[in-house]
């Protein structure tokens, strides 16, 4: 056998051996500097025990995509390949719903009806501008259930390129969240507190609807605490989380004790508090003014014991959302967006899962939150920009502020905390205090 034939046979045998070994020892490598193709442990945990297929239809397909959205398609494909590499039951297809002209309009109507809102894009090509419609959505189906997965994460004021970059960072969460909805049945329960003149259902309907995709939701009133405090506490302990959305009526000591003991027994709570009574609608009168006053909810000692103080002051800032007002007389009036210092836009520098990749959040007549030194861990979730000032109450608020030139030097109070997470071992508000009634097995922490 000549040397050339030996070399060829050796090469063939080596290739067969490599192919056999690679088939047995399959491994994907992420060589990107930011490891964006490496799934997080939490994302892997969602699908690791999946035993039947999740089929994903992605509608991000087309011929006339801008380059930014071709990148989004590529990143989506590579991410789903990573999911599929972790569990072969992740199956995906790219579909162009607009490819066939004869079914184009019907497909648009059907997808829109299912909640997949189309997106209109500007396309620049050869110096010419045109418009394109895309559906940046995916539908994931599992065991006769289907969820919508948005591929675009909107961001206020972002260009198309910035929008896509922001969306790429959000892709893993979007798919992991969608898969979790399909795989994990609802287990936890949330109580929406009623009875202290909280927001009416119509004002929190969208919020509650979104929560309902993950949790069981039910209203809960503390009215029975006067006659049946022990039963009220037992009933509320059945919930994993309570939400009090903008209460406007003070809490009684009896109600506070039940809420305090709920916390002592491991219950979680979300408090959406306005410490100042002021509504934008109240300014739409002949004078364009109204008075902002302190709203006493009888919760000062409650929050103080847990490590925060919500001050009855309004935050005024140069970095805020505008107010829309009709300017001019009669038929000549026009709606204009005007600078309005009482609607701060709050963001976060934290990478905490609650606020990671969260857009700016608009507040109205927001109040300053101080944190106090104790053993409770405090995470600042939302903060204003640094150009702020604090306005005490009572005080008159007027729409005329939109016509006044603001002095930036007076906005010198720095970043203000508008949302904070408290974690740790809490001590009872009623520890070493006379309680409004006796409770069996009351806890001090």
Task: Describe the function of each predicted region.
Residues 173, 184, 200-445:
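Acidic, S/T/G-rich, low-cysteine, solvent-exposed domains in lumenal/extracellular/periplasmic regions
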Residues 4-249, 256, 274:
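Juxtamembrane extramembrane loops of integral membrane proteins
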């Amino acid at each position: 056998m000549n040397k050339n034939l030996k070399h060829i046979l050796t090469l063939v045998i080596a290739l067969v051996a490599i192919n056999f070994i690679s088939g047995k020892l399959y491994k994907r490598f992420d060589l990107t500097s930011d490891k964006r193709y490496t799934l997080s442990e939490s994302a892997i945990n969602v699908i690791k025990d999946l035993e039947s297929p999740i089929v994903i239809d992605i509608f991000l397909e087309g011929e006339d995509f801008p380059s930014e959205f071709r990148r989004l398609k590529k990143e989506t494909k590579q991410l789903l390949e990573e999911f599929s590499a972790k569990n072969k039951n992740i199956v995906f297809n790219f579909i162009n719903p607009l490819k066939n002209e004869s079914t184009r309009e019907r497909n648009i109507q059907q997808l829109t009806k299912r909640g997949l809102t189309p997106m209109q894009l500007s396309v620049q090509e050869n110096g010419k501008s045109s418009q394109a419609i895309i559906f940046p959505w995916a539908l994931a189906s599992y065991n006769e259930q289907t969820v919508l997965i948005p591929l675009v994460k909107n961001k206020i004021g972002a260009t198309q390129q910035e929008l896509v970059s922001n969306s790429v960072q959000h892709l893993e969460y979007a798919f992991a969240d969608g898969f979790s909805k399909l795989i994990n049945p609802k287990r936890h329960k949330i109580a929406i507190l009623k009875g202290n003149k909280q927001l009416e259902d119509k004002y929190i309907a969208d919020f509650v609807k979104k929560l309902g995709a993950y949790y069981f939701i039910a209203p809960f009133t503390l009215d029975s605490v006067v006659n049946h405090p022990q039963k009220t506490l037992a009933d509320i302990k059945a919930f994993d989380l309570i939400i009090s959305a903008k209460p406007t009526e003070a809490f009684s000591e009896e109600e506070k004790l039940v809420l305090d003991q709920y916390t002592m027994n491991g219950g979680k709570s979300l408090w959406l508090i306005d410490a100042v009574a002021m509504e934008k609608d109240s300014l739409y009168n002949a004078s364009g003014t109204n008075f902002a006053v302190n709203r006493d909810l009888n919760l000062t000692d409650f929050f103080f014991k847990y490590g925060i103080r919500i001050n009855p002051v309004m935050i005024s800032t140069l970095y805020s959302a505008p107010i829309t007002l009709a300017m001019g007389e009669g038929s000549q009036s026009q709606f204009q967006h005007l600078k309005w210092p009482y609607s701060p836009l709050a963001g976060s520098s934290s990478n905490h899962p609650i606020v990671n990749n969260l857009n700016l959040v608009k507040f109205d007549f927001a109040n300053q939150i101080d944190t106090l030194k104790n053993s409770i861990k405090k995470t600042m979730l939302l903060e204003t920009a640094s150009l702020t000032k604090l306005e005490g109450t009572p005080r008159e608020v007027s729409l005329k502020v939109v016509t006044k030139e603001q002095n930036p030097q007076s906005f010198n109070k720095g970043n203000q905390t508008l949302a904070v997470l408290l974690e740790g071992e809490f001590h009872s508000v009623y520890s070493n205090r006379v309680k409004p009634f006796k409770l069996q097995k009351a806890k001090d922490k």
